[in-house]
Amino acid sequence: MKKTVERVISLLFVIALLTSLAVPVSAMKKPEFLLAIGDSITSGYGLDAYDESDPYSCGSYANLLATALSLEGKESYINKGLNGATSADILKNLPEIVNYLGYSDMIVFSAGVNDLQNAIPIVASAVAGKTVTGLSASIDVLTAAAPEKFSALANNQSFQKKIGDVLAKYEKNITDIAEIIKTNAPSARVIFLKQYNPLNNVPGFETFGKFADTLISSVNASMEKVCLSYGFDLVDMASAINADAMGLTNMLNYDVHPNAAGHVEIARAIANHLGISLDPAENTFDVETEPETTIEETTVSVELTRPAETEPETDAQTETTGCASSVSFAMIVAVACACIPLKKKYA
């Protein structure tokens, strides 16, 4: 009796040891199809190897995320970033990509920079006290303006109404976008990206950069509101870029787009949120396999269920990707096999 107890204790110890050595598994189930929706930041505009007709070869954050998830461009990942698109443009274009929504289980959305860029002449006109048209002329006015000119805008009712209309339209547009996404992809994991300030601490843009923060904060507040309402994820792309806007964007050339390093930081922010690495070799996703065991007389039959489109798992694969409970189950079956003939059947 004493020896039997000792053997049981030894067996339990071995099981516990193997369980502790099991390969950790991400809590996230690997998505089968990724859809990226947004503007030129999503498409990867300005990056080496960027091609508007084929945006899958450059190092955009969307492409980097797809690589981390082991998804293939044009097959299991579609990039629908529209260069120069405002939230209104993206909303207008959604009916053309609604079919992609239907079979996407992960969707990343980013928009806002062009909405605000189109509002820059409104700010410049209010600061100058006269009508200013065009982005270049507006930037000249804003970079030369004294801080008190921006402070005075708080009491400028005409300006407040105009900029308020811009922000209200943005919130309505992204709300409508969220509604369409939720309706057509109710089970998808949807990720909105908070907008960054490309002027943050950039020499020559200090005063306007601080004022831009107030506008961008309003845009991000709208995003937070929509994500809370629809149960979407919100990733802080802003923090990823704002810490070093000069080094992570192309502002040296007066271009607000992220450079290659900036796209890496955006992709890393999303990956960290998901609990994965940008290196696909380091990622192990949750595989939903639920073994079913039936014992008939002297035969043990093991049914291993698996996703319909994957190859049958080998014993080695099960040991690599299985969870702790799978290791314990395997040990129990192994002990049973010492006395009972074992027959495995794969689904």
Annotate each PLM feature.
Residues 195-287, 291:
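Catalytic His-Asp segment of secreted/periplasmic serine-dependent ester chemistry enzymes
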Residues 19-31, 315-325:
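Sec-dependent signal peptide cleavage junction
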Residues 151-160, 176-213:
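Active-site segments of SGNH/GDSL-like serine hydrolases
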Residues 47, 89-165, 197-198:
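Oxyanion-hole/transition-state-stabilizing segment in secreted/luminal serine hydrolases
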Residues 11-20:
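Bacterial N-terminal signal peptides
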Residues 325-344:
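A cross-kingdom C-terminal cell-surface attachment/processing module
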Residues 28-83, 95-102, 107, 126-132, ...:
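Serine-esterase "nucleophile elbow" of acetyl-processing enzymes
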Residues 276-321:
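C-terminal low-complexity, Ser/Thr- and acidic/Pro-rich disordered "stalk" regions positioned immediately N-terminal
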